[in-house]
């Protein structure tokens, strides 16, 4: 589940910065919720193609590759080749760790720009691109601050990060425009529990990005420093200091074939 961000220095976010590695790790865990369904819908586990040559494009922390490794039978992995590519060296650090810990067979990790891979055409039998964009809306915490402050909804935030990839009809249209056949698109919803401390940390990491996009400079000067504590109070008040925060994760799973 890739990212389309607004332009301009105040609204820009370097999602490949080291500070966001932990946030991507959470995104990777959420991605794993849906990876089995994506892989199953692709038909790869039952593919008769030999050898399998798989690209995990924009692999992030290696969530899809990890599920692939545990899903595909040893007979198919004996002569397959798996390439994990991402633009960020920081993200690939996590993928390399997973590759070594889980002893992936015939796998390589390399820098790849998802928008311009420069990889050979018609080389791969299967290509997966799965990206998770998790954002804390902060809306409830913002409304507890004084001042008439914009409290963006989840839909408004996703309108910044996820343009064109958050509606089934739009995703289908993109696949059709790219020349895919046998297109299947469906929405899947799952629940994910996150430790409160991790939830709060992820929210506070994103505060500068959210307020830079939706608040004026005067609003940031007056209230941004108060927002981290407001987040702590709201989340701990709702879930308890040592509790688990419940998140509802939603994914659009889309597959298609090219001949």
From Swiss-Prot:
State the protein's name. Methyltransferase afvD
Pathway of action: Secondary metabolite biosynthesis
Which residues lie in coiled coils? none
Output the lineage of the source organism: Eukaryota, Fungi, Dikarya, Ascomycota, Pezizomycotina
Annotated GO biological processes are: methylation
What is seen without this gene?
Fails to produce aflavarin.
- What is the top EC class of this enzyme, as a single word? transferase
Q: Which InterPro entries match?
A: Methyltransf_25, SAM-dependent_MTases_sf
List keywords of the entry alphabetically.
Answer: Methyltransferase, S-adenosyl-L-methionine, Transferase
């Amino acid at each position: 589940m890739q990212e389309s961000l607004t332009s301009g220095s105040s609204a820009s976010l370097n999602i490949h910065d080291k500070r966001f590695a932990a946030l991507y790790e959470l995104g990777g865990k959420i991605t794993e919720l849906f990876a089995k369904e994506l892989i199953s819908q692709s038909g790869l586990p039952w593919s008769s193609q030999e050898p399998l040559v798989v690209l995990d494009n924009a692999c992030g922390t290696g969530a899809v590759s990890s599920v692939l490794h545990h899903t595909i039978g040893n007979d198919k992995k004996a002569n397959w080749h798996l390439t994990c590519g991402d633009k960020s060296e920081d993200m690939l650090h996590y993928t390399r760790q997973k590759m070594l810990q889980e002893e992936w067979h015939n796998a390589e990790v390399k820098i790849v720009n998802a928008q311009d891979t420069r990889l050979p055409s018609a080389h791969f039998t299967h290509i997966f691109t799965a990206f998770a964009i998790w954002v804390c809306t902060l809306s409830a915490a913002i409304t507890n601050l004084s001042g008439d402050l914009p409290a963006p909804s989840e839909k408004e935030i996703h309108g910044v990060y996820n343009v064109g990839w958050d509606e089934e009809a739009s995703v289908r249209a993109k696949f059709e425009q790219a020349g895919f056949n046998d297109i299947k698109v469906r929405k899947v919803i799952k629940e994910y529990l996150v430790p409160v401390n991790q939830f709060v940390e992820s929210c506070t990491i994103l505060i500068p990005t959210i307020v830079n996009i939706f608040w004026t400079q005067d609003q940031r000067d007056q209230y941004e420093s108060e927002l981290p504590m407001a987040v702590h109070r709201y989340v701990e008040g709702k879930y308890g200091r040592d509790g688990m925060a419940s998140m509802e994760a939603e994914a659009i799973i889309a597959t298609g074939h090219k001949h």
